[in-house]
Amino acid sequence: DAGRRFVLDRVLREIPRIARPVECGVALAEVHNLERDEAVSLLREREIALAASLELHQGGRAKALAKGVPDQYLIEVEREGILLEAELTWLRELIARLADTDYPWGDAAGMPTDRYLAQREAARR
């Protein structure tokens, strides 16, 4: 089905990308359509990219402060670093949950109810 393929392609493309948080949010809402191992693998790719970005932000901020750049000019860099830390913490917890085979996933999690499917369809409109 073309619609399903479109969704899966989007999930595969957007989860590892850290520069597009809104698109990643949409992809995360559909990650349940992937096999567990594939979902965990994509999330680990994202984790690596986020960790690298966090290191870059923290290192850049530290260097700027060491050179005497006033903190007031680095507020956004600080904010971005804190947001990256928060996302990394959440993502690592999510990966641990999904990697645990006791965590229901796919068919083992049960089928969505008709009410859920209707609400999901209404939200798309």
Where is each model-derived feature located?
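Hydrophobic stripe of amphipathic alpha-helices that form coiled-coil interfaces
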Residues: H57-G60, A64, L91, L98, ...
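Long amphipathic alpha-helical coiled-coil segments
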Residues: R97-T113
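Amphipathic alpha-helical coiled-coil segments and their boundaries
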Residues: R36, L43, P70-Y73, V77, ...
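Amphipathic heptad-repeat alpha-helical coiled-coil/stalk segments that mediate oligomerization
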Residues: A109, T113-R125
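Amphipathic alpha-helical dimerization/coiled-coil segments
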Residues: L8-A62
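Basic, amphipathic "hinge/linker" alpha-helix immediately C-terminal to the N-terminal HTH DNA-binding motif
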Residues: D1-L8
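Acidic interhelical loop/turn segments
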Residues: Q58-R79
